[in-house]
């Protein structure tokens, strides 16, 4: 077996791990946006959260397509344990009378996790087309994070 084959398969395995981790994060994010959106009172925020949930589903599908194109793992649904805990916390806040500010705070925490996941992924050695895709997705996530934060902050000043 040549060294190049080992290096190539190692790089493929690393890419697979990075993409699978991001897919789990995106699944958490998709569910989080949908769950929080269900509890928000502001209609325009509800629409934004539904759109973001759908966008995260699209991001996830793009990454799954890259895995399939490279002949790698099938993705199993599930998300992360941290994501499940975070969503449960958001649901509990909503059920205990959480206002939109508190829900946006929870959403921003989730977006902080997504930002970190993308930063960590882009710190890895990945093929250029994958890096470009992740950079585009990351740019959207940063914009979304800033939108959530600015609306959360605006609710404090009202």
Which residues fall in each region the model found?
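Carboxylate-rich helix-loop segments that flank metal/cofactor sites and access channels
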Residues: 62-115
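Conserved alpha-helical segments that form or flank metal/cofactor-binding pockets of metalloenzymes
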Residues: 45-81, 148-151
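Alpha-helical scaffold segments that form or flank carboxylate-/histidine-based iron centers
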Residues: 14-22, 43-61, 100-104, 129-143
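Alpha-helical bundle segments that constitute or directly flank the non-heme di-iron/ferroxidase center
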Residues: 7-41, 100-125
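Preference for long, well-ordered alpha-helical segments
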Residues: 107-158
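Charge-rich, acidic-biased intrinsically disordered regions
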Residues: 9, 47, 54, 74-91, ...
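Generic structural concept
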Residues: 16, 23, 27-30, 53, ...
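N-terminal/domain-start segments enriched in small and hydrophobic, helix-friendly residues
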Residues: 1-24, 68-69, 78, 85-87, ...
């Amino acid at each position: 077996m040549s060294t190049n084959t080992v290096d190539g398969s190692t790089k493929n395995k690393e890419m697979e791990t990075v993409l699978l981790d991001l897919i789990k994060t995106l699944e958490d994010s998709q569910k989080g946006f949908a769950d929080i959106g269900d509890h928000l009172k502001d209609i325009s925020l509800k629409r934004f959260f539904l759109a973001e949930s759908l966008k995260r589903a699209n991001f996830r599908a793009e990454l799954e397509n890259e895995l399939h194109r490279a002949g790698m793992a099938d993705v199993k649904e599930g998300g992360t344990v941290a994501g499940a805990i975070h969503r449960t916390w958001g649901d509990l806040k909503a059920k205990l009378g959480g206002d939109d500010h508190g829900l946006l705070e929870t959403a921003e925490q989730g977006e902080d996790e997504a930002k970190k996941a993308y930063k960590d992924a882009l710190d890895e050695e990945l093929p250029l087309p994958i890096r470009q895709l992740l950079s585009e997705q990351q740019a959207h996530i940063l914009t979304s994070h800033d939108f959530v934060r600015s609306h959360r902050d605006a609710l404090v000043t009202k």
